[in-house]
Amino acid sequence: MARRTTGTAGTASGRGTTVRAARRPELRLPPLTPYEDGGGLEPDGDYDALEFREADLTGQDGAGARFMDCALTGCALDEASLRAARLLDTRLTGVRGVGTNLAEATLRDVELLDARLGGTQLHGAVLERVLIRGGKIDYLNLRRARLKDVVFESCVLVEPDFGGARLERVEFVDCALKQADLSAATLTDVDLRGAAPLDLSRGVDRLSGAVISPTQLLDLAPVLAAELGVRVVAEGGTLPAV
């Protein structure tokens, strides 16, 4: 079971605005029973207090399954279908995979540690009290997902897609955010100050509700100017032809 922890609110620069910190899960897993692969995952399966260690779940179908108080360690998740699955009070450590389908899944009180994932589908998913720490995730699809109390810490996100997603109390801590897409996203109490680099491919106009550092503001200046249609030319310089 997870013990809820309350984060300490930080203070954003400018007008003394306070950003509410994300609440992190603190898992306390019960004694676990080793998972015995008797034919693989099953759609709508029920998995309670199990330890999946070095399990090869490649291509398996666990759509709609429920994982409660489980630990997945060193598992292969290539092309695994976990669509609409529920991961509750569960820890995933060192999992790897390409094309894992978690669309419309629910992740609540979950830790994802040192993962190596690519093309993971989480569109339409619900993430609540989730910690993603370490590892690298390429092309993470979070379109129209709902994220509340989510922390990305010491990880690398390459071209994550937050298009149309709703983010509330989301923190990026010592995290590389490369070519992120925020188009049509809604942000509330999103702390981006720990993202380095903070690299946005789209959606700079959706930063309302986020907190950034003065340095990040300078880094984003060219993108913001382009979004506003402002031409930046040194005094005495020649304006480009229109």
Regions found by a protein language model. Give the residues of each.
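Tandem repeat scaffolds
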Residues: 2-242
